[in-house]
Amino acid sequence: MAGKVLGRSRYVCYNGSGDNGGDDINDDEDDKVSSCGVRTEPKLTTATLTEDVRDGAGDSESSSSGVSSRPTLANPVGPSYSSFQVDSFKLMELLGPEKVDPNDVKLIRDKLFGYSTFWVTKEEPFGDFGEGILFLGNLRGKRETVFEKLQRQLAEVVGNKYNLFMVEEPNSDGPDPRGGPRVSFGMLRKEVSEPGPTTLWQYVIALLLFLLTIGSSVELGIASQLNRLPPEVVKYFTDPNAVEPPDMQLFYPFVESALPLAYGVLGIQIFHEVGHFLAAIPRQVKLSIPFLIPNITLGTFGAITQFKSILPDRKAQVDISLAGPLAGGTLSFAMFFTGLLLSSNPDAAGDLVPVPSMLFQGSLLLGLISRSVLGYATMHAATVAVHPLVIAGWCGLTTTAFNMLPVGCLDGGRAVQGAFGKNALVGFGLTTYALLGLGVLGGPLSLPWGLYVLICQRTPEKPCLNDVTEVGTWRKALLGSAILFVILTLLPVWDELAEELGMGLITTF
């Protein structure tokens, strides 16, 4: 029968005994044709698969001794594997992002760069898949002035096809003689480097998450008002002999009393997102629709808001990232402090709800503020009666602190990346993961929050167009103050301090 030789285009004709018509195979046998009408080839079996197959030429080297004396290959299918590997690379290249046109690279190098701007000495791949070009060389002027000039000339030379990035030179030997880090210029196609628009299914998901967040916020309000359940309702759910369901009219006042807390939690988060958008508009940065994350303990874990355009510089990244937590945190603290004042007002006694005093041990900062306002007598008890605004503000401040953790693309991670660079974010991120894993920050919420970040928010932001220029001292100082607020808010009160301050009833065995 005829069989196809691996890696070859010719066919072999075998007889029934497995012979090839002779013991010796000569080089001229490659040109002979057997009686079955196809070219004869040396016999290949499992034991004697030793022919050195050569890709393309079609001719094999043979010795005068026999098939069994031929040199043995370590991998007889090597050429086929190499061909498959090359085809795989070609397929990945076709399916991958579109690369920069080599003709445009030559044109840009000749027209843009030179003695007065940036003297190019080397070119390297740029981007996640090497789809762009990175120009390395020597800067010939002030980096901001040169970058602005290159951006303007790029649009004049090739139109609106590419985005130009100014980044720190990778593996640089030292700083720039003019001061600061050495810079390079990367170029990517706009359709590759710019985020895509928000799709219809993303709007649907955002709507579903918003409805779920409303539900979790209402659930939080209901949980805070359980002591106000009508006796008939409590009896129905606790007495096994009660078979008659209570009148639904009894639930309406109970649910209405739970709504203010839900409104407060949702209002804080909406205020947070408005802060992001108000900071993004003057900087011409587009943001996606917020994807709210429901949580039954805090009402919400915040929201995922994506950048839908490339950030112009690191200052814009810091400003937009801090604007949301600053807005939401300010409103949260106003609610929290106002609620504490109302909690100590006898006229508001009818609106107060009891909460476990252990709650105030969950945050060092908020616990100390509560202790200073409410006093020893109120705090040194199993439960503390507080106004619902205290709970709303507490939840809002805790959510704000979690979102300001310096990791991934959280607000805190974006701000740290913009203020101190991507390398600093790696160090901050590892430290944050360690503290969350050990339960040092966040208490019982550290595990679910850490999983949420790992699944949804672990990836840092992509570079800004100008990813080199520093953000200034006051922005770094503001960010440092925000991180200090995060630590003090998420750090719990240790038992010795709580007992000394009279925060709750500490029981030791």
Regions found by a protein language model. Name each.
Residues 1-509:
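Hydrophobic transmembrane alpha-helices and their immediate loop junctions
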